[in-house]
Regions:
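Catalytic nucleophile-loop/oxyanion-hole region of alpha/beta-hydrolase
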Residues: 14-47
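Serine-hydrolase catalytic core
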Residues: 125-182
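Conserved alpha/beta-hydrolase
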Residues: 2-16
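Active-site nucleophile loop of the alpha/beta-hydrolase fold
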Residues: 81-95
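Short beta-strand immediately N-terminal to the catalytic nucleophile in serine-hydrolase-like folds
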Residues: 50-52, 84, 166
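Active-site signature of alpha/beta-hydrolase-fold catalytic machinery across serine-
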Residues: 62-66
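Gly/Ala-rich beta-loop-alpha elbow adjacent to hydrolase catalytic centers
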Residues: 51-60
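Short, flexible helix-coil linker/hinge segments at the edges of structured domains or between repeats
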Residues: 91-121, 154
Length: 182
């Protein structure tokens, strides 16, 4: 059998407002805790598979990259990744998302902290999205891309676990090119 552990990422996957004051490093810390718990329930040498959708896919990749660099053996190395529309790259304009929120420092312009505010009826993704969510998404993807380049240069990327990736041609949130190239 399998032991499956679902992770509720802090500030993500509950209500869009949870992303207003969140940092991607907190998401990664929660990912590490979840993998540690999964390993406690199914200790090695049982295989460890990480499955992630969108932001969860990016966090699975970041965790796997960190595990490659971990010389202490603290981080369990995943045997395989299954990535569903992983957020490996986002639009280059996401880098500047934080600038849009600057007027929100004034109470009269609080809505500037959001890229859009709409009714929430889609169970698979937010319709409303805070600017900080876009900024943290960019920061996470940028960290992944830098780490991939560094590990490729050192030759350590060759030990990256096999990854099965699914990407929708209708997904406008993540970059398909980044999944292939980065």
């Amino acid at each position: 059998g399998f032991i499956a552990l679902g992770l509720r990422i802090p500030g993500h996957g509950t209500v869009p407002a949870g992303l207003v004051n969140m940092a991607w490093e907190t998401w990664l810390a929660a990912t590490r805790l979840a993998v540690r718990e999964a390993r406690a329930q199914a200790p090695g040498p049982l295989p460890l598979h990480l499955v992630g959708f969108s932001n969860g896919g990016a966090l699975a990749v970041k965790y796997a990259l960190d595990a490659l660099e971990d010389k202490t053996g603290t981080l369990a190395r995943p045997d395989r990744l299954v990535l569903i529309s992983p957020m490996i790259g986002v639009t280059r304009f996401a880098r500047f998302a934080g600038l849009k929120a600057v007027p929100a420092l004034l109470p009269a312009f609080a809505n500037a902290a959001w890229l859009g505010i709409m009714p929430e009826f889609n169970p698979f993704k937010y319709n409303s999205f805070p600017v900080n969510g876009a900024r943290q998404s960019y920061r996470l993807t940028h960290a992944i891309q830098q780490q991939v380049r560094q590990l490729a240069t050192s030759g350590e990327l060759a030990a990256f676990p096999p990854a099965l990736t699914f990407q929708s041609v209708m997904d406008y949130t993540v970059s398909t090119r980044s999944i292939i190239a980065d």
